[in-house]
């Protein structure tokens, strides 16, 4: 009771979304809110029974841990197939997909709410228009042990329900084979993740190209700071897009991982295996009671073992492969756009560096000119100082002494200019000055 009061008080005082809320979107498009705080062991165990997921998968979808990982730019992207569920963790698209429903954490988060609305709209559109009872959650249709395994009897009922949903989908499509529920939900998650990353990329491009062009025309502290922020965002978005692309590429390269995503066929396969094993057991009991001959009983058992043990779960992954390839092409195009923008940023940086080098060369040339002028002026001052010594010479007594001063001054100035021009000529011949 105390834990419940604390939770209600915290939820009533802050409008922010609670970290333990989950939205359950069923095959008919309906959504139900389910409070599942991580700190309450009972509710967490209920989620584990409902989805058959280990605790580490639920922790990976924890919004608090995801926010911390996103802030440190190390948030993983993964599509993992488990026994009864598919864990989707692609940037903002985080969900647990079962054969009959989709569980989305933190549905009131403004970044996640569009995903919930899209799931409700798309799944409701794909559902049968005839009124039918919504499929029961996995915890009511299947019994889960401590290790997450499914009991054969409940797996049989789950497989029949999943097969029924598949038939309804085929009837909707007018004879065309419809995608299973988990593929439709996965498609919505992939589309949401790709569109959100594409939207971020387009927004960044609209801000980046004008800022880079302005920087090339005018290098200032404000423009440099804008470009620095744009480059930081570019690195962050490129990392997220690259992780999603790598995950899709990994799935396309691994048929076993793609086979693990076929939840509906997996349930139907488990149901058929259970029926075969049950028939084999009944036939064995009947043979042992009615026939006492070893040869007849052994032959019958061998045939049953061949039926029961032959083959393994290997679904046709063509539909899933086509689905993943379409979004792989889309996310690869987004990555190419980011690569083009990165090249444009690098070209702009090279251009700015060339401009700065040119300015630096001009400053160095100006320093050489000033240093040479200072040297020539020092020489002229030294000559003037020599003539300024108070020593009596015959020039003072000469009648032309009145004209000697301007001639000496003009000679010093002319000599200084000639020496300066000679130094400049030597610099140009040596290639120091342009």
Swiss-Prot record:
Where does it localize? Answer: Membrane
One GO BP annotation of this record: magnesium ion transport
Q: Which InterPro entries match?
A: MRS2-like
What are its GO cellular component terms? membrane
**Segments crossing the lipid bilayer:** 367-387, 405-425
- Bias (Basic and acidic residues) occurs at 279-291
Gene3D superfamilies attached here?
2.40.128.330, Magnesium transport protein CorA, transmembrane region
UniProt-annotated stretches for the region Disordered = 126-171, 279-311
Q: Which UniProt keywords apply?
A: Ion transport, Magnesium, Membrane, Transmembrane, Transmembrane helix, Transport
Name the family. Belongs to the CorA metal ion transporter (MIT) (TC 1.A.35.5) family.
From the Swiss-Prot or TrEMBL record, give the protein name.
Answer: Putative magnesium transporter MRS2-D
Q: Which organism is it from?
A: Oryza sativa subsp. japonica
């Amino acid at each position: 009771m105390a834990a419940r009061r604390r939770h209600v008080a915290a939820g009533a005082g802050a409008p922010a979304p609670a970290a333990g809320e989950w939205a359950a979107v069923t095959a008919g498009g309906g959504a139900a809110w389910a409070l599942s705080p991580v700190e309450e062991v009972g509710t967490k165990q209920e989620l584990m029974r409902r989805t058959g997921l280990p605790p580490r998968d639920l922790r990976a979808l924890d919004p608090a841990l995801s926010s911390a990982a996103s802030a440190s730019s190390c948030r993983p992207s993964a599509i993992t197939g488990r026994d009864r569920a598919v864990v989707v963790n692609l940037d903002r698209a985080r969900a647990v997909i079962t054969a009959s429903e989709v569980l989305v954490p933190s549905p009131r988060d403004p970044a996640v709410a569009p995903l919930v609305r899209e799931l409700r709209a798309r799944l409701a559109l794909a559902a049968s228009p005839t009124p039918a009872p919504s499929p029961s959650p996995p915890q009511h249709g299947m019994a889960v042990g401590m290790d997450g395994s499914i009991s054969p009897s409940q797996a049989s009922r789950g497989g029949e329900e999943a097969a029924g949903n598949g038939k309804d989908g085929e009837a909707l499509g007018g004879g065309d084979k419809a995608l299973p529920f988990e593929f439709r939900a996965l498609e919505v998650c992939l589309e949401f993740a790709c569109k959100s990353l594409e939207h971020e990329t387009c927004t960044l491009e609209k801000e980046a190209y004008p800022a880079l062009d302005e920087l090339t025309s005018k290098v200032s502290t404000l423009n440099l700071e804008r470009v620095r922020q744009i480059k930081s965002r570019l690195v962050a978005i490129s990392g997220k897009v690259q992780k999603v692309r790598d995950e899709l590429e990994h799935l396309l390269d691994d048929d076993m991982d793609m086979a693990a995503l076929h939840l509906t066929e997996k349930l139907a396969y488990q149901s058929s295996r259970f029926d075969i094993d049950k028939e084999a057991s009944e036939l064995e009991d009947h043979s042992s009671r009615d026939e006492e001959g070893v040869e007849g009983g052994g032959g019958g058992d061998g045939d049953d073992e061949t039926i029961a043990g032959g083959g393994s779960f290997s679904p046709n992954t063509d539909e899933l492969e086509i689905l993943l390839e379409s979004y792989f092409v889309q996310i690869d195009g987004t990555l190419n756009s980011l690569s083009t923008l990165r090249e444009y940023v690098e070209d702009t940086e090279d251009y700015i560096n060339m401009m700065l080098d040119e300015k630096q060369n001009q400053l160095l040339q100006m320093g050489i000119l000033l240093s040479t002028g200072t040297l020539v002026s020092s020489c002229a001052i030294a000559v003037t100082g020599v003539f300024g010594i108070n020593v009596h010479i015959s020039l003072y007594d000469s009648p032309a002494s009145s004209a000697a001063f301007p001639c000496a001054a003009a000679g010093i100035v002319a000599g200084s200019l000639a020496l300066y021009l000679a130094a400049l000529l030597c610099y140009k011949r040596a290639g120091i000055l342009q």
